Regions:
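Amphipathic alpha-helical dimerization/coiled-coil segments
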Residues: 17-21, 101-130
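N-terminal helix-turn-helix DNA-binding core of bacterial DNA-binding proteins
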Residues: 19-58
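Basic, amphipathic "hinge/linker" alpha-helix immediately C-terminal to the N-terminal HTH DNA-binding motif
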Residues: 82-103
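Canonical helix-turn-helix DNA-binding module
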Residues: 46-88
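N-terminal leader segment of winged-helix/HTH proteins
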Residues: 1-28, 125-130
């Protein structure tokens, strides 16, 4: 498989994943919220607002807004760091763990699906019939 084929496959998997997330019942996460959630759940060490901001190269207020929304959805919880009361630790929740597990399944299904532009025989947008 060539590099271009790999890229098309990845784009197709991403598209299928995003479409499935949009269609399902549940919270509609922004790209930033999803990046914060994935970082919190896929990194082994505890995450802080400061650390997330550095890792994702965004401002602390942007991380705080994303965490506010994720906390509203009960996907993360904040706790003051007992060793440094100025720092806030981001904790995982059962609902967030379930979302990540479901996301993995959605991605597996999307990876097996038809490539981009081949959804049920529909033509790729922007292409004229020949």
């Amino acid at each position: 498989m060539s590099g271009s084929d790999d890229t098309e496959s990845l784009v197709g998997t991403l598209r299928g994943t995003v479409v499935a997330l949009v269609r399902r019942d549940g919270p509609d996460l922004s790209a930033r919220q999803l990046a914060v959630l994935l970082t919190c759940y896929l990194e082994s060490e505890a995450q802080t607002v400061r650390g997330l901001a550095a890792t994702l190269d965004v401002s602390k207020p942007a991380i705080t807004r994303a965490l506010d929304r994720l906390a509203d959805f009960d996907m993360v919880r904040r706790k003051t760091d007992p060793t440094d009361r100025r720092s806030v630790l981001v904790q995982r929740t059962p609902k967030g763990t379930t979302f990540i597990r479901d996301l993995r399944g959605i991605m597996k299904e999307a990876a097996k699906a038809k490539p981009v532009g081949d959804a049920g025989g529909r033509k790729k947008p922007g292409r004229a019939a020949r």
